[in-house]
Amino acid sequence: MFDATTILAYKGKNKAVIGGDGQVTFGNTVLKGNATKIRTLYKDQILAGFAGSTADAFNLFDMFEGHLEACKGDLLKSVIAFSKEWRKDKVLRRLEAMMIVLNKEKIFILSGNGDVVEPEDGAIASIGSGGNFAISAARALAKHSSLDEEELVKESLMIAGELCIYTNQNIKILKLED
């Protein structure tokens, strides 16, 4: 259940975009095909998406939003404060969820054990069972196509939906623009 979804984020030149599929599974059963796993945070200045347990993810969203408020929307400071709290709390360390958070300047993956990872290229991140398919497609499309950020995320998630049985093609997208 921890990885059964796909979230892809792309921080381009003109937009920051996050997208996710809508499939919710329990074991080998599809429970829902149109779930929303992405949202905006802190005055619509931060994009976030989750993979993993829905209940755990909502708790993490609430906690992270508290850190964003305390840090006045500073994404880097919020991520560091959130990670410190996550690692110190025994209950949090057992939560089965991962998050991607981004704004127009930075992008981070928050792992299930409290690690913070900034993608090597600083532009593309993915989580979930179809994450490797989506990020591979996104990197190829970024390098060899003229798709804008939103189209690139959608097309990459559609490709992941063709390959990953835990990912569908009911794609939702959120973006931040200049």
UniProtKB/Swiss-Prot annotation:
Residues at the catalytic site: 5
GO terms of biological process kind: proteolysis involved in protein catabolic process
Keyword Cytoplasm: yes
Name of the top EC class for this enzyme: hydrolase
InterPro entries attached to this UniProt entry: ATP-dep_Prtase_HsIV_su (IPR022281), Ntn_hydrolases_N (IPR029055), Proteasome_sua/b (IPR001353), Proteasome_suB-type (IPR023333)
GO MF annotations, alphabetized: metal ion binding; threonine-type endopeptidase activity
Keywords recorded for this protein, A-Z: Allosteric enzyme, Cytoplasm, Hydrolase, Metal-binding, Protease, Sodium, Stress response, Threonine protease
The protein's role, per its UniProt record: Protease subunit of a proteasome-like degradation complex believed to be a general protein degrading machinery.
Family statement drawn from the similarity comment of this UniProt entry: Belongs to the peptidase T1B family. HslV subfamily.
Protein name: ATP-dependent protease subunit HslV
Species annotation: Aliarcobacter butzleri (strain RM4018) (Arcobacter butzleri)
